[in-house]
């Protein structure tokens, strides 16, 4: 079986009539292939199914955050509802800032409400930078209740095609649970839009977790804009479409970091959006200005990822450290997995240190960056730092080779000895502005002006249904 995501998508969507996989509810027909596609490929790549909001831990977490700013939903009308997660917050000048939406909100004439999924982290309201914020819990809990009472059974038309796709991918998911989740999203958001003052626009991240919401918003005449949070390419299942599907549950606009993603979405993918738009990355401007000039390589930032890939990254670096004559200072930045969890598995030498600083601060104060296949591989370049990708199970190349393969400051390594040779060769680092300029196609400059142009372009936008 081919293991390239793009090839697998082509295989599935040319062989099967994926548009015919539907469910009927509320006197409407829903194309559910995108719902299944997002989850089955996620499980195939990462090894586990992504239905975090269905776990007992998640339900308890949402209940605890039920009153976190929730009054803000009811007491005023907003220009924008912006759906995000608390993982997007990083500490800047004493305040936890949402790196997707807080800065663009300052360029808008209207009010922004940040609606935050707080499964992973929760920050005190007094310590966040957002002017208006609400927990997403009220929506999630209402969906859970509705699903349990009214969606006990689901009917999927052409379910046999799902089984054929799962067989081809050698991976299966709980299709009924996925369908219930999205139907509950749709039904309850239609309810809340009758109760709450409606926004003029909805901004969100991770559209493939919000299909039910998107359809509800667009049916109510509210345009939806997705903001890029990670890699967008032919090897991301949520953005690579060959099949032509109805636009009703897809965002109208996708705001991206740079020209590579813009060209891919506008010219190659059949994802049924109206257009993509380049704005850049707000967090990059801030930290690039504060990044130290590159020196002889001594310190290395490491962007860890959750799950088995994080452990394999550490195993690789520990092996590298044992064989390297030079003992570099490694600054490890975990994502959600805790430092204590890693230390239960590994014994770290003195030159490996976990840091409490966010990944951008860490990169800007180190000489180079290493990761497996985190988006940080791209961002490090715009911060002026060389990017080294550990090609575990060929995933780094699957994700980044088409995007970064021609960049002279990007290096894929399969074995620890390769990294030793490269660092010896790269002992003299290039100036940070040289590395930054090499990445303009991936993260555009002029973030402020790009945001202002985007907001202006939305003024006459109608949702495509």
Labelled PLM ranges:
Residues 1-465:
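Catalytic-core helical/loop segments in enzymes performing group transfer/polymerization on anionic/lipid-linked
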């Amino acid at each position: 079986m081919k293991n390239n995501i793009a090839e697998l998508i082509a295989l599935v969507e040319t062989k099967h009539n994926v548009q015919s996989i539907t469910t009927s509810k509320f006197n409407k027909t829903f194309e559910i292939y995108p719902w299944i596609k997002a989850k089955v490929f996620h499980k195939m790549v990462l090894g586990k199914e992504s239905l975090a909001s269905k776990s007992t831990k998640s339900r308890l977490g949402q209940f605890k955050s039920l009153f976190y700013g929730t009054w803000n939903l009811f007491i005023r009308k907003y220009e924008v509802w912006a759906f995000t997660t608390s993982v997007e917050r990083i500490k800047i000048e004493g305040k936890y800032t949402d790196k997707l939406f807080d800065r663009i909100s300052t360029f808008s004439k209207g009010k922004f409400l940040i609606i935050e999924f707080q499964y992973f982290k929760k920050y005190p309201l007094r310590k966040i930078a957002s002017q208006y914020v609400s927990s997403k819990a009220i929506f999630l809990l209402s969906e859970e209740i509705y699903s349990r009472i009214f969606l006990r059974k689901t009917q999927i038309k052409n379910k046999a095609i799902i089984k054929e796709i799962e067989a081809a991918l050698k991976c299966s998911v709980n299709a009924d649970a996925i369908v219930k989740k999205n139907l509950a999203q749709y039904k309850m958001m239609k309810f809340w839009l009758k109760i709450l003052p409606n926004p003029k626009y909805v901004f969100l991240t991770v559209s493939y977790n919000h299909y039910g919401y998107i359809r509800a918003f667009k049916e109510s005449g509210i345009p939806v804009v997705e903001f890029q949070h990670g890699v967008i390419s032919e090897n991301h299942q949520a953005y690579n479409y060959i099949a032509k599907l109805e636009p009703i549950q897809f965002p109208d606009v996708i705001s991206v970091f740079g020209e590579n993603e813009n060209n891919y979405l506008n010219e190659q993918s059949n994802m049924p959006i109206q257009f993509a738009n380049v704005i850049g990355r707000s967090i990059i401007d801030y930290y690039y200005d504060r990044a130290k000039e590159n020196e002889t390589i001594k310190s290395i930032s490491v962007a860890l990822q959750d799950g088995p890939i994080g452990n394999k990254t550490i195993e690789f670096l520990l092996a590298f450290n044992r064989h390297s004559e030079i003992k570099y200072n490694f600054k490890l930045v975990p994502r959600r997995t805790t430092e204590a969890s890693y230390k239960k598995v590994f014994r770290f030498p003195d030159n490996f240190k976990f840091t409490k600083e966010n990944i951008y601060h860490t990169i800007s104060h180190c000489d180079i960056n290493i990761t497996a296949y985190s988006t940080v591989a791209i961002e490090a370049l715009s911060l002026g730092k060389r990017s080294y990708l550990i090609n575990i199970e060929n995933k780094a190349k699957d994700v980044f080779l088409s995007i970064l393969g021609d960049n002279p400051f990007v290096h894929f390594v399969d074995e620890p000895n390769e990294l030793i040779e490269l660092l010896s060769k790269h002992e003299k680092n290039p100036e940070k502005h040289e590395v930054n300029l090499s990445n303009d196609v991936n993260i555009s400059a002029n973030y402020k002006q790009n945001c202002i142009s985007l907001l202006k372009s939305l003024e006459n936008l109608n949702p495509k249904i």
